[in-house]
Structure formats: C-alpha cells, structure tokens
Design a protein with these regions (language model features):
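Positively charged, Gly/Ser-enriched RNA/tRNA-binding surfaces
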Residues: 2-21, 31-32, 64-78, 83-135, ...
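Short secondary-structure junctions
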Residues: 22-27, 46-50, 305-306
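Beta-rich nucleic-acid/ligand-interaction surfaces
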Residues: 27-46, 143-153, 312-320
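Polyanion/phosphate-binding surface patch
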Residues: 29-59, 84-85, 97
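Short amphipathic alpha-helical patches
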Residues: 37-41, 152-156, 171-178, 188-193, ...
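Acidic, His- and aromatic-enriched active-site or binding-groove loops in soluble protein domains
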Residues: 46-55, 156-188
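A conserved hydrophobic position in a structured secondary element of the catalytic/binding core
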Residues: 61, 143, 359
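Internal, well-ordered domain-core segments that constitute the primary functional module
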Residues: 103-173
C-alpha cells in the first residue's frame, strides 16, 4: 500500500487552526468500533474497516475524528468551553479515491451561545478554505435538522414515525419513500388471534406477558434474543405506524417545507411565512435559526455565498441542529454541524453543547493543483 503523504500546506493549516484558540488533539489510529457503529450513520458504518483484538473486542481503523475527539475530552475530564483541532489520516472504504486520506478540522465543545458558535464554525471553515484557496469562489449550503424535527413534531405524527423521518433526514431518496408511504393508506398485518387482539389494543404490558408465556412454553430463551417487553413494544409500534396516514393538509405542508430553498439572507422570512401558512408555531428552532443568521452577519461573513435548503442534511446520525457544507467547482471541501446530544451518549456526566467541521484535505489539494494549472 502506497503511503499517503501530507500536502505541502499542512503546516500552514495547523498554524491557522492553532491561531483560532484550539488545542491540538492527538487521536490513536486504532479505535473502539462500538461508538462509530452506534452513532455514525449507515453511510459511514458500511465503510468502516473492522477488526478484533485477542479479547474479542471490536476495533476499527479511525474513520473520522469527531467521535474520538469527544471521547478523549470526556476521558481527560477537561473543563469547557474548549476547542480542539486535528489533522490526520482517516480510513474508509470508498468507491472513488483512496481508502486512506487526510482530514483536518475543529471541534468546539461546551460553548453555551449556540448561535454564535454555529456562526463561528461556518466562518472558521470558510476562512481556512479561503486561506488555502485564495480567490476561489466558495458555495456554502446550510441546513437545520432541528427545524425539520420541529415541523415533523408539529404535524402530530406518532413518535415512531417522527423517529423514522428524522433518521432519514439527509437521505433524499429514503425520506421521499417514507413520505409517500405516509400519504397512502396501508393495510394492517395484524392477525385475528389473541396475539393480534393484544397488538391491536396497544396494550404493551399484557402483550409482553403473553409473549413471555409463549416463550416459556416453547422453551425459547430470552437470553438468545430480545426480551418480551422489547418484542411487544416493537410490534405495537409497527402496527401504529401501519395505521398512520398523513392528512392531505399535513402531507402538503411537509412537501412544501422540504422544497424550501433560498439565499440565507431570505431564509428567515421564508420560514416565518411557511409556519404561518401551515398553521405551525414558530418555536425555539426557528428563533435559533434566526439568531444564527444574525450571528453569521455579525461575523462579517459574506451571506451572498450562502444558501439554505430545508431538505439539506448530512449522512451522520449524530447531528442535532445546524448542518453545512462548503463547495468549490462542484467538489465538497468541508462539512460540519451541531451534535449536542452526542457527549452524554458517549458518557459525559453533563450535557455539553458541541459543533464542529472537517476539511477534506485531498480535495483541497486537488483544487489547489487545478488552480495552479489554470483550470
């Protein structure tokens, strides 16, 4: 395997990140696999290089930096707010390009001013790219998972459907399939039997007792599979989802929201108009979005290069709010977002707000080379 060399601008980039009040994180290449498998999303999970140690523990080659930076912060019991920077190789199976490549980035942990830290993440990523690619036109696409979650909740869907739709956010094809299935009536698969009656009634406790009795009578051990309570909960949820249908009004509202696309400078007014037309309360998600836009303006960033798309998400399960990508000539050079729930899921004893971004070093290098060739 040919070694992947650091680009000639690596030292410049490291210095530029350090100048932004960051602490350099040194992350081992070999990582415990479980946190990535649990939180990284299907797109990344299927690209991870997995192995085991002699104790049978699942390990992997480092597929990204955000999760291990957070784990390192928790293990070090370091106070917040604290900003980390990194530059190193990541390892992923890819259809195009090498399977090992460099990423750099900044993770901002513990800053309680959400709007300001969101704006700073976008500005830092854009400024670093501007330093490495002077004179190159950058396009910034912004989305917000919290806005989508608020709209879905406002439509009154069952929790199971909300969870499914939120999980699919960022995967346009999967989301479209779910919305279409919600718009059409579905036949129930519940059988006419005692089990079927319990499922249809939605009585999880009675259903779990019935399943437990059947498992005992058949000698089926719950240690080999899920517990009766888990099975009962899933069966009731599945039936509830099958019976759910979006009203024509709610379906139209969801489709309209996902079609919203505007320059960032016009996005807040567009969102307020949508909420009024759809009969939805503006709520904290919209107010935070508006505050973030004001924070971006206050940072002196050029809003003319920024566009908001309601349907825009990124294929990582840990995002909770802001998501963004920065492109040049059709190539995505940076991406990031907010992941406020991840720190507690990884073991932090208190909630720690977090936002960050990664730079794709191989793509930046290709863009620099193309610029030098005058392409």
């Amino acid at each position: 395997m040919t070694a992947v060399q650091l680009p000639d601008f690596a030292d410049e980039l490291v210095a530029a990140m350090a100048a932004r009040d960051t602490n350099r994180a040194e992350i081992p290449v070999i990582q415990p696999a479980e946190p990535f498998l649990d939180m990284a999303g299907e797109d990344l999970r299927r690209r991870i290089y997995l192995t085991e140690n002699e104790n049978g523990d699942s390990l992997c080659l480092r597929p990204e930096f955000t999760i291990p930076v957070c784990l390192g912060h928790i293990a070090g019991q370091v106070g917040t707010p604290r900003r980390y920077s990194y530059l190193g190789q990541v390892f992923r199976q890819r259809r195009e390009g090498g399977n090992e490549f460099y990423q750099a980035g900044i993770e901002d942990l513990g800053e309680t001013d959400t709007a300001a830290s969101d704006a700073r993440a976008i500005a830092d990523a854009a400024d670093l790219l501007g330093q490495l690619l002077p004179g190159t036109g950058l396009t910034i696409t912004i989305g917000d998972q919290a806005l989508f979650e608020a709209v879905v909740a406002g439509l009154g869907l069952p929790a199971g459907w909300q969870k499914r739709l939120i999980h699919a956010f960022g995967d346009d094809a999967a989301l479209a399939r779910m919305i279409e299935s919600l718009a059409s009536a579905q036949s129930s698969t519940v059988e006419e039997s005692e089990l079927g009656e319990l499922i249809a009634a939605g009585d999880v406790t009675a259903l779990a007792e019935h399943i437990g009795t059947v498992m005992e009578e058949t000698g089926y051990s719950s240690h080999a599979s899920r517990l009766p309570e888990e099975i009962a909960t899933r069966l009731v949820e599945k039936t509830e989802l099958e019976k759910t249908r979006l009203s024509d009004t709610a379906f139209a509202a969801l489709k309209t929201f996902l079609s919203l696309d505007a320059p960032l400078s016009e996005a807040v007014d567009m969102l307020r108009g949508f909420a009024e037309d759809a009969g939805l309360a503006s709520g904290p998600a919209l107010e935070l979005f508006a505050a973030r836009v004001e924070g971006i303006k206050a940072s002196g960033a050029d809003l003319s290069s920024m566009r908001w798309r309601a349907a825009f998400g990124r294929p990582l399960d840990y995002y909770t709010g802001l998501v963004f990508e920065i492109s040049a000539n059709g190539a995505v050079l940076a991406g990031g977002g907010r992941y406020d729930r991840m720190m507690t899921l990884l073991g932090a004893t208190e909630e720690i707000p977090a936002v960050g971004f990664s730079l794709w070093i191989d793509r930046i290098e290709a863009a620099r080379n193309a610029k030098e060739r005058g392409q």
